[in-house]
Amino acid sequence: MRINRSELAVPGARQELFEKASNSASDIIFLDLEDSVSLDDKRKARKNVIEAINDIDWKKKTLSVRVNSYDTKFIEEDIKNLLKLTSDRLDLLMFPKVNNSAEVMKLDKLVSEYEISYKRKKKIGFEIIIETTLGLINVEGIAQASKRNEAIHFGAGDFAASIGAKVTSIGGVNDSYGVLQNKKGNIRNYFINDMWHYALFKILVTAHAFGLRAIDCPYGDFSDTKGFMSLAQSSYTMGFDGKMVIHPNQVDLANSIYSPTEEEVEEAQEILLQMKEAEKKGKGAVAFKGKLLDIVSIKQATNIVKMANKIKMEKMK
């Protein structure tokens, strides 16, 4: 599975940003032909992206392109031209606003036909964005619809519009979505809730059930470092693999948060050692720092150590 701690969005109409993106520390770069590009600029942006894929040194980064959505007149031309005119440097196609498994299966068939027609050597992987009500209720079928599927993203902005949410920001919390503490004297604290928790958790569970990466939605206020870090830390703790980022100043933050800390790795290694010793003594559980460790602890600790080793290997390439 690819490392996907940070995934930097780069508008296809903004050629001046391509080189900067290639020099960033983002694990994955996605060049965008969809929401960040006006209708009048769609074809020009596609041409820009094709040239950038072929001409720019993207180093060892994973390179993706977000094409236009399934219900637009642009999507087939996007896919055809990308697979016909780009080198094998292209790794992934990102599909926005996916509503059901049938769409993914048709896209898989289309991509397969073009791969054969244009004699492409590398098999293209898929990233799916869930950002509609239909997409969320059908996410389990969508996740299984193609062997090309690698990651499921949550798109909070369009999802908010699809449910009629009274928000204008992309991702983050909303001060109006909260509850008052039960009345105790004259003091009643107000607690802001996470209005995206259900959608995030459903996507997270589905992604991991079918061996896909779970990627959190972008945080629109790129000037709010603390807000970004708070939500990223929350989704990392839940089990998300990474986060879509919309500004270069969010890349290092995401890479740091979605990587196990030295303390986490050291503790995980110690847990594995303790459990190995317990196994030698015929024990299935052991006390460690005042907590009970058992077989489940081995799985959790192994995940942390594997992720740390994978990041270390990537840095050595």
Positions of the model-derived regions?
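Expand to "…catalyze enediolate/carbanion chemistry for C-C bond making/breaking, isomerization
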Residues: M1-K317
